[in-house]
Amino acid sequence: MSTHLSVNVNKIAVLRNSRGGQDPDVVQAARSCIAAGAHGITVHPRPDQRHIRADDVYALSTLTRMHGVEFNIEGNPFAPPRAGYPGLLELCRATRPQQVTLVPDGDGQLTSDHGVDFARDGARLAPLIAAFKTLGCRVSLFVDAGNPEIAQAAALGADRIELYTGPYAEAHHHGQSQPSLALFADAARRAHAAGLGINAGHDLSQHNLADFLAGVPDVLEVSIGHALVGEALYQGLEPTVRAYLAIIAGGATTAA
């Protein structure tokens, strides 16, 4: 099984929006990632439009279809439409991405930092998952590795989960990754047993990706943005994407 790399281009939009105008060009950055071999492009449009905007979503949808790579839209399915943000379901209706990842983040969060609460939100999620699937989208739910109810994602109709890897990255940074890897491996096995595909993302980097993939079975896709864009400032965007692909292929070790 080959793990796919989906590059999250949110941070390109952060840099653009910090100055206004169109530079750096999010579509051109995504095109470079695809040219380097990325299997897909991920975006997480937020209602406050702090980075990716609706017009970026439409343009990136066209680009990914043109190049035959996956488009993954992340977002909070409960966030209502507002000026400049038509809502996650409407964005997916307009662009029909191959995958939508449902993330329970609030408007004020700096970044996604927790997974779905099945007890609280399961009843609301089921009809939304069905609605996304009628659009032809594969549906993935953002989950915490320690959640005992991961199998509930399958019962709600989801196709995959995305394991929130922030805690693993923190543990790896402090040289304490083994207990975290055991937790994530158990989560992956439980998901697989329930018939779910396994994605992973958040704070994965060249420093920790190889160890994660070696320790966690059956990972179909990793979504990486913040670290990849940061590393690209030193290494260049296309070489950085190729470095990640080499790690995924087992052709490179973790970075020093």
Curated annotation (Swiss-Prot):
Pathway: Cofactor biosynthesis; pyridoxine 5'-phosphate biosynthesis; pyridoxine 5'-phosphate from D-erythrose 4-phosphate: step 5/5
Compartment annotation: Cytoplasm
Keywords: Cytoplasm, Pyridoxine biosynthesis, Transferase
CDD domains attached to this UniProt entry: PNPsynthase (cd00003)
UniProt cross-references to InterPro entries, sorted A to Z: Aldolase_TIM, PyrdxlP_synth_PdxJ, Pyridoxine-5'_phos_synth
Residues marked Transition state stabilizer (site): E162
Binding site for 1-deoxy-D-xylulose 5-phosphate: R46, H51, T111
Parts forming coiled coils: none
GO cellular component, one term: cytosol
Amino acids binding 3-amino-2-oxopropyl phosphate: N8, R19, D203, G225, H226
GO process annotations (BP): pyridoxine biosynthetic process
E.C. numbers: 2.6.99.2
This protein's record includes keyword Signal: no
Pfam family, one: PdxJ
Active site: H44, E74, H202
Reactions the enzyme catalyzes: 3-amino-2-oxopropyl phosphate + 1-deoxy-D-xylulose 5-phosphate = pyridoxine 5'-phosphate + phosphate + 2 H2O + H(+)
Subunit comment: Homooctamer; tetramer of dimers.
Record family assignment: Belongs to the PNP synthase family.
Function: Catalyzes the complicated ring closure reaction between the two acyclic compounds 1-deoxy-D-xylulose-5-phosphate (DXP) and 3-amino-2-oxopropyl phosphate (1-amino-acetone-3-phosphate or AAP) to form pyridoxine 5'-phosphate (PNP) and inorganic phosphate.
Protein name, entry field: Pyridoxine 5'-phosphate synthase
Organism per entry: Xanthomonas campestris pv. campestris (strain ATCC 33913 / DSM 3586 / NCPPB 528 / LMG 568 / P 25)
